Design a protein with these regions (language model features):
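Glycan-recognition and catalytic cores of secretory/periplasmic carbohydrate-active enzymes
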Residues: 1-166
Length: 167
């Protein structure tokens, strides 16, 4: 997953998606894998996989009936949010954790890191297009850092496209 974060390759992507299913298949209903410290490695890998598949974004408040997924293209990120029940909350984007938490000048590869996928530049302008028309427009990174308010009815889907700024 760390390698894929830096070098997107379709064969590597397919292998990761295949192998995570093997890992998930090992998990018992209790959540335990093998009952030793290696379970922590599994949990870390599962978190890394989840961060990749959401491009680092998350929803607040969390609800088990609300799902988020994301994909990236060369200059865009697509976020899809679905809710089984009515839900109101915010889509929160990841931050440049290497800078804001670890005080590192660059996001260099490190053992046990959680890769950064889509992070905001607070001084940039982002373009958003969505099937929820009220979300369409230009946003400053510092405003997006606070989240995007979303309201979903039961079984509704929200699609949001965020275009990277031109630098």
């Amino acid at each position: 997953i760390n390698l894929y974060n830096r070098r997107q390759d379709s064969e590597l992507k397919a292998w990761i998606d295949s192998e995570i299913q093997v890992l998930f298949g090992m998990q018992k209903n209790s959540g335990i894998i093998e009952g030793w410290h290696g379970d922590g490695n599994f949990a870390r890998t599962a978190l890394m996989y989840g961060l990749w598949k959401t491009q680092g974004a998350h929803l607040e408040p969390w609800q088990p009936t609300v799902k988020i997924g994301a994909i990236s293209t060369k200059d865009k990120r697509y976020f899809v949010i679905t809710a089984e029940d009515n839900w109101e909350g915010q889509l929160m984007f990841d931050q440049k954790r290497h800078k804001t938490i670890l005080n590192l000048p660059v996001d260099y590869p490190r053992i046990n890191q959680f890769p950064e996928w889509f992070t905001l530049d607070q001084d940039a302008i982002y373009s958003i297009e969505s099937n929820q028309k009220q979300l369409n427009g230009l946003y400053e990174g510092k405003d997006l850092k606070l989240g995007i308010k979303i309201s979903l009815s039961a079984n509704e889907q929200c699609i949001i496209m965020v275009k990277k700024p031109r630098i």
